[in-house]
Amino acid sequence: MSLWLLAIAGGSVDAAILIGFNVLTAAQTGNTILLAVALARGDAVGGTSAALSVLAFMLGAALGALLLGRGTGNRPSLLPVLLTEAMLLLGMLGFWIGVKPLDRHEQLGVIALAALAMGLQSALALRLHGPTTTYMTGTLTGFSTGLVEWMQTGWRASARASPGRPSGRPAGPPPWRSGLTWLLYLASAIGCGALFLHFNELALLLPAGAVCLVILLQLRTGGCAPGQARRLD
């Protein structure tokens, strides 16, 4: 549930920032291409935005790794990362509301805050070895290859099936989890994009709210329940 909420946050932020400033702050693979195209065209404005997004994302990921390392034993401390991300998203929204219309420097500030938040979120998903929540290339690859493995293993198990014999299904998470993550990412990007076109920066309440819901879920389990070092459900 929590990873799916984070996927909603990732898709929403990228859609809103892309519509607003023509740059990606979560999906850095695509943003790297935007940077390359801007450099090839000699587009200083687009290149500056994309480069800042990359750097801020990297800083956010590094900060996330530091915060996660403060946990004890094999239990990463999730709440500091989630709280920091929520504060960045809400701070970005408050800043945007308070100073609009944004000049160029203020736009760069919004881009940096969004990329910092998405870097934190990416570090969290990476540490927990779950589906990615800020970019979908790996998630789609995992879904496709996992589906093939799941089907092949199931067919072999059915051919050898006998009473009392294990089913032979793959031990890893079922591929539908990655598929659903992608669908939620897509749906949230569509929804937040539509909201942004009608309500401008207020659309960012969607990703901020999703992260706040994850925080509430984590508070119910003490930040990270035993055995959750590799999962965030």
Residue ranges and their predicted role:
Residues M1-D233:
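Alpha-helical transmembrane segments of multi-pass membrane proteins
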